[in-house]
Amino acid sequence: DLLEALSQDQKLLMAKFLPHIYAELANREGNWHEDAALRPLHDHDYPGWMDF
């Protein structure tokens, strides 16, 4: 297993930086918008959903 071969310092670096790298890549590709993700759920529009 690749993760078992890593040192503790390498695992900590990965845990610290991978989320930032994924977010940056997603922003470049237009798959994820930070401002939209931070809005409260009740502000999102879900067409076809019924309000009770």
UniProtKB/Swiss-Prot annotation:
Record lineage: Eukaryota, Metazoa, Chordata, Craniata, Vertebrata
A Gene Ontology term for the protein's cellular component: extracellular region
InterPro entries in the record: Gastrin/cholecystokinin_CS
Keywords assigned: Digestion, Hormone, Secreted
Function of the molecule: May control digestion processes.
Metal-binding in keyword set: no
Protein family according to the UniProt entry: Belongs to the gastrin/cholecystokinin family.
Compartments it resides in: Secreted
Keyword Membrane among UniProt keywords: no
Protein name: Gastrin/cholecystokinin-like peptide
GO biological process: digestion
GO molecular function: hormone activity
